[in-house]
């Protein structure tokens, strides 16, 4: 019988056989798992990145970053039990600082992991890898917006490219501090630019681009976007005015009227510049606002004779004549012409004709022949004397002159010590023969003939000067005119040359004393002008007449070899071009020329443009109502060279005005870039008839120099002259021997309105010996068009011993909103002590703000155009030189950037921050390469001396 009892042993063996097919739930529940992984992130300056790791069933967690274990003391641990599952866990966190990343020494990314384990460290679980980045943002934007002024309806793009950063920065645009919301017209481009497809007036404002990431937030400088609207004319109004005329009455009185057209009826019509009106300094409508036409008058008028003119002078045949014209009135509408002769001749009266004409002619011929004979004999004698003087002078050349110490007052300002690199040319009118006893030369006196218009400066090294390279007495130069053989027989006034040997440069041509000739017909320019000259080579130079308000910059490589160039200033009316009645001169005549007789006056020696700077008297702030015109004479007479705002491809000069508000006396200067030697003058007229333009004038009060002069009747002279510098220099020469008691700058004078000078608060002991209010009518002051406008104020002392004088002079203009100018006048030396001995001192400097190598390196970087306009065009806009950009690109042999830097050199004269400001401009443009060039230069030369 079989036993049905199960075999336990066999069952046990069977369970063992199937044990591998069942899970060990207990071991699975106790397995270490990481539930919170450390996350990648950024370290921000002083803010570390916190890495967090959580593991279940673990007893400890450690961190390993870039193959190095983190010290356990830095790890914050938290042990707990999950309230839901009841599973135990450990939470560990650590702060990764910038120092950890910087000191890791790994070239690759900084990576961290956490490791969870039990007590026996047999089961270790690693987390995911977390990468730690250094968050940063560079300072400078790769592309920055630039100020723009565009017409309404045009497309406008403001570029912006964030600085180099990690993580990538987000860009936000602001307008007047408010975030710009994109719409159908305002588009945000993928490169960060802000595009306005059709600019609207409401889009005008200050725009800023902001770049933001976790590390920082940076903004560009605000740039102004100005949307302007050019004006447009409305329709013409109907003709206004009646054409009725009483013909019988007109015929009755026609003979009394010089021109009947003055009384004939006219019709008038107008239009308005409001379709649309100009906005945001948009261009005003071109053309006339008003139109008139003469009425067609049916009246028939017969011609009538005018009165006979005065008798002419008697001719050589003892006859004289007089004329009349058929103009009172002229015949109209088929009227009869005048009958009779319009010319009458008769013999001169007996007392005016005592001999027959043939005898007079014979007598004149005899006189002329005698004079010619005497002139020939005198010339022969003078030639012999000149040869004798030359031989005598040559025998004394071996004995060099010893420089003598002279009192500056006695020397008349001849000797000046200058720092190295500065060479001064003295051009003062000397009445004495200061050095005449020391110099003996056959070329000390010569007579230049009258010549054509072109004026040059003959240096001591030219022919006919008797210059010797071994001569120690210095060089000589004189203003003369180049002449042809056909004019060599003409006469001219004698020019005296004197030389100086003290405190001069090694190059004799840098220090020369000029005596002015008194006959302007010899020079072509008034000899009262101020002038400075220098021998210039390829290194260039700066010539300056500071008190006359004129400067000349000759850049490097502007001339080949060595050339003597000069800068002169004249405010004489006869030197100015002929202006239209509505135009007014706004500057003196500025002359740049060559002192080389071997060159033709029409040959251009310049290889690149030079920059001429001068002061003007136009008032352009707060309202600029002037339309400026630059007149130039390049050898063929005065012509309009530039009408500001109307430049075209034929414009060969560039004119730049300083912006209002510029420091260092920069406002009121005009800079002209020209490729030729020329005479220049700035003129202007109101933009339209309905506007009134104003000038800036200089007020000055002169009085006696000696205190004893105030013990007897005396007078004060109040001058009102243009604020150009040269005008005041002319006043100084006119007031030679007087004393400046008080002066004031930038008084605004309108063309219309009488000028009044009022005396107040005269000190007790003196009385006004005349009217207390002097009024100069507008027809007399003529908008200070004439030189030296002034009035005299007379005073009388009441006491014999009184000499201390003071009063108050108030200057104002009727019908003007300008504030009256109050001038406190006193003769106390400690209050205001200035005399006419302060004269112009021309100076020459060979130093520039930037060396040629630095400018050449900047030119190589900025000449290459790019799409963002952060090239030379962007630099021109930043410097406000972008009114006529084509000028800078019109010279094939010249870099546009170098031309801009030449103009910047002239504009920044006297500014101590010129180079740092240029550095900041390049930085705002987003040109770190150009910034590096200037920073390297500034680090090598930290102290930039402003020329």
Swiss-Prot record:
SUPFAM superfamilies: DEATH domain, Immunoglobulin, TSP-1 type 1 repeat. InterPro entries: DEATH-like_dom_sf, Death_dom, Ig-like_dom, Ig-like_dom_sf, Ig-like_fold, Ig_sub, Ig_sub2, TSP1_rpt. Disruption phenotype: Failed distal tip cell migration along the dorsal-ventral axis of the body. RNAi-mediated knockdown in mom-5, ced-10, ced-12 or mig-2 mutant backgrounds suppresses the migratory defect of distal tip cells in the respective single mutants. Changing residue 719 to F: Induces a strong decrease in tyrosine phosphorylation but only weakly affects function in vivo. Glycans are attached at residues 206, 305, 308. SMART domains: DEATH, IG, IGc2, TSP1, ZU5. The chain crosses the membrane at residues 369-389. It comes from the Eukaryota. Residues 857-938 form the Death domain. Disulfide bonds join 53-112, 160-209, 243-295, 247-299, 273-285. The modification Phosphotyrosine is found at residue 510. Expressed in cell bodies and axons of the VNC motor neurons that extend axons to the dorsal midline and within the ventral nerve cord. Expressed in gonadal distal tip cells (DTC). Its main location: membrane. One of its GO terms (molecular function) is netrin receptor activity. CDD domains: Death_UNC5-like. Phosphorylated on different cytoplasmic tyrosine residues. May be phosphorylated on tyrosine residues by src-1. Tyrosine phosphorylation is unc-6-dependent. Receptor for netrin (unc-6) required for axon guidance. Mediates axon repulsion of neuronal growth cones in the developing nervous system upon ligand binding. Axon migration is mediated by the secreted unc-6, which promotes attraction of neurons and axons through binding to the unc-40 receptor, while repulsion requires both unc-5 and unc-40 receptors. Involved in the ventral-dorsal and anterior-posterior migration of distal tip cells along the body, which may be mediated by Wnt receptor mom-5, ced-10/Rac, ced-12/ELMO and mig-2/RhoG. This is Netrin receptor unc-5. It comes from Caenorhabditis elegans. The gene is unc-5.
